[in-house]
Amino acid sequence: GVDSTVSAILLKQQGFDVIGVMLKLWAEEGFNRENQCCSIEAANQAHRIATKIDIPFYLLDAVEPFYKAVVQPFISSYLSGETPNPCAWCNPLVRWKQLLLYADAMNADYVATGHYVRTIKDAEGFVHLFRGMDSQKDQSYVISRLSQDQLQRSIFPVGDYFKSQVRKISAEYHLPYSE
């Protein structure tokens, strides 16, 4: 989406070598609703935008780890009368795990996402998580379960921006979702 794309743009401006990676989390053939995070159209759009901003793009298959770590526990929790939050499980157990494995394979030092959070490393090297600058878009809750090792290797470029600023940067690059 716009937040991930602008994160890539900001990192390129800072001199990072950037690649685009999207996780395929769902295998159901009929799951192709427009503007859904895992749809074929979303993957195609991500590839087109990566090409437009001149970064390589990779689609990683994470269907099995997602099903085991998120879907099965979600179903069990729901059937037990709980109200599960799949994002809280997905980020540390699937998204970051898979992205960091791929980063290691690509000899990449960091993983960056378009989440609206901020981090600060203290003098002892401990990474502290803070709310994003835009309180309306803050996503610290869904990032809060990341391990210290995962946070050490994570960058959140849009955490210091308001959504309106992110959309303005997107518009400067004539991206399709800048409104």
Per-region residue spans from a language model:
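Active-site and glycan-interaction determinants of carbohydrate-active enzymes
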Residues: 173
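ATP-dependent adenylation/nucleotidyltransferase module used to activate substrates
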Residues: 2-145, 155, 164-166
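Rossmann-like dinucleotide/flavin-binding elements
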Residues: 170
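Catalytic core of tubulin tyrosine ligase-like
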Residues: 167, 176-179
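Short gly/Ser/Thr-rich phosphate-binding loop of adenylate-forming enzymes
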Residues: 161
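His/Asp/Glu-rich metal-coordinating catalytic cores
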Residues: 147-150
